[in-house]
Amino acid sequence: MESGPRVEPGPGAPAAVLARIPQEPRPSPEGDPSPPPPPTPMSALVPDTPPDTPPAMKNASTPQQLPLEPVSPTGQVSPQPAPPPDECPSSEAKSRGPTPTATGPRDAKPSQRSSQPSPTAVPASDSPSAKQDVKKAGERHKLAKERREERAKYLAAKKAVWLEKEEKAKALREKQLQERRRRLEEQRLKAEQRRAALEERQRQKLEKNKERYEAAIQRSVKKTWAEIRQQRWSWAGALHHNSPGRKTSGSRCSVSAVNLPKHVDSIINKRLSKSSATLWNSPSRNRSLQLSAWESSIVDRLMTPTLSFLARSRSAVTLPRNGRDQGRGSGPGRRPTRARAGASLAPGPHPDRTHPSAAVPVCPRSASASPLTPCSAPRSAHRCTPSGERPERRKPGAGGSPALVRRRLEATPVQKKEKKDKERENEKEKSALARERNLKKRQSLPASIRPRISTGAELSTKSKARPTSPSTTWHRPASPCPSPGPGHTLPPKPPSPRGTTASPKGRIRRKEEAKESPSPSGPEDKNHSKSRTAEEKEPAAPASPAPSPVPSPTPAQPQKEQSSTQIPPDTAVPAVPTVPTFPTAPPTAAPSVTPSKPMAGTTDREEATRLLAEKRRQAREQREREEQERKLQAERDKRMREEQLAREAEARAEREAEARRREEQEAREKAQAEQEEQERLQKQKEEAEARSREEAERQRLEREKHFQKEEQERQERRKRLEEIMKRTRKSEAAETKKQDGKETMANNSGPDPVKAVETRPSGLQKDSMQKEELAPQEPQWSLPSKEMPGSLVNGLQPLPAHQENGFPAKGTAGDKSLGRAAEGLLPFAEADAFLKKAVVQPPQVTEVL
């Protein structure tokens, strides 16, 4: 701080010095004799001035605060007087604008400088400006504070509005989320309800299906049970040895022997079709081949052989014991077959299900109610025992009838040969018939039905093949059992050819069908048929021991049977001719062996055998005849169908050829008609063109004639006009000559010689008049000569130029002029008016050909 007084520049100081004055250090407020009011702090003034205020605006009030400064030379603003103190601050603020023009520190500097005493400045002049500056600063601070408060209020209101909008948006979003969650929950509940309803419907449907399947199976089981029970009581009711019906059992069997195979076939077919076929063809099997536990148990029960079935298949037990002894004494060749039959019986579907009193795997459902139990249980035990125990079981009956054994051994070789031939023929015939039947069925049905029908045919043929053994064994007890008396001996019965080959033939047929039937079907049908054959062979196994009691002296026959049963499925059985020859037995064998044959024919075994063989032969011949007739009828039908088809094809071909011929004929006629039409149209076109050409030529000629005629008329009119003009000129020339002569005479006689000279025509005028007379006249539309400008007007000749109103210019003699006018009209006295002769020429028409 300087202790001395500060020197301030005078009024004439330059601007540079004045610019450096604010840079000097300020005196402290304590040293000032009259300190100004304390300035506003910097922090309160800084927000009032915006940062983009230019420095010129900030220093705008500096010239007013320095009254001692001179007027700035160039570019300086001249100092203006300060506004009066009583001005309203609002008007000052409005005039200054929204932004303040000066800051606090810059405004405070002049006040501090002006408060200091200076030798040149007047002290009284600085105090009002300082007060005004302080007052302005306070007003500015107040305005700035008000603006800040308003700004804060505006921001607070804006923030409140923004917060309110945010709250509204948040509430709306929450509401939308709740609505969406509610809709999703409703959809989930609806889906669960639908799923629950669907599951309930499916469960009810499954229960209904299960009840329906169970009811169907129960009905089939009940019906099968009723039929089996009825047939069981009717078949085996009198098989007990000590029953009173024993005496009539032989006659009953002999009476029903012929009709029995068909009866047994139908019963067993019904049984199989109503039990196993129902299960295999049920809708549950269509869904899955795996059966449930209760279904498999029912299938096992139905497929297990019953006592009645075993009794029927083992009806050879009713033969006399001597026959069985004969079969046992026939040699060791029968034992492999018996052992094989027993072995085939032993493994049943369920070996653990055995009767408490028998060792046979029979179904327990027939153990209680079957009347066959007392007699069939020991027989079945006898049939199922191993081959080593059989001699002990048959020993008691071996020594009872030595005569029968001896007579059996004495059987003639002719009968043995006949039996073998018949066996071979029967086997060949039936295998060939089975093959032909299958082929016919397969050929007669369409391809879409073959897989189903092949399976059904397989089932039917298998079911038919199974009861062959019981059907043949029912023929054996045709002769009653002989009494044990010593004197009653019977001749040996020749073995049944059908019974000996029943089991091998059935097996061969089953193998052939298993080989042929799966071929049109798919792999599923193959597996199905294999499983069916495996299940059907198990209950069919008891049928195989049927031919066991048939005797044969040599082991060749069992070996042949065993080889025939072991034929692989690939080997083809040779075909047989359509009408085979049958060897007949010698007629002397029967009377030589049967000397004591009764009249009824039912007690003699040989007679019964012969009758049975005869019936079989007749039936076979009848079957062959029917088959041959069927074949012939089929061939005839086939030929007729072929002929019908050929005739239809020929008729169709003829119709097609006729249709083609008609179409070709129609096409030719149509083409010819079109050609004729084209020719006719062409001819008409040519004729029309010729007619048009002729018409055009005729019109052209007419036009030419018309033009020639018009030209001729025009020439005639021209000639007449020329004649008229010539006459008119001649009369005018003569008249003018006379007048000229008279005028010259008058002029010569007159006192004035000048007028006579003037009136006399000159030589030039006379020459021109002569030339005009000699010139050729123009046509009617040409203009007249100069001497006669209006020669003819409506048939009147106008007066000459020197006459006016019919009188001469000098008007000496009027009667002469009248006479001339009359002479001028003379040429028209003989002809018509001129306008009447005027012909309007037609327009030229140019024709384009």
Curated annotation (Swiss-Prot):
Listed Low complexity bias regions: 568-582
Intracellular or extracellular location(s): Cytoplasm, Cytoskeleton, Spindle; Cytoplasm, Cytoskeleton; Cytoplasm, Cytoskeleton, Microtubule organizing center, Centrosome; Midbody
Record-listed cross-link Glycyl lysine isopeptide (Lys-Gly) (interchain with G-Cter in SUMO2), residues: 462
Modified residues (Phosphothreonine): 49, 53, 99, 120, 554
UniProt feature, compositional bias: Pro residues: 24-41, 479-497, 542-556
Similarity section: Belongs to the MAP7 family.
Protein name as catalogued: MAP7 domain-containing protein 1
Record lineage: Eukaryota, Metazoa, Chordata, Craniata, Vertebrata
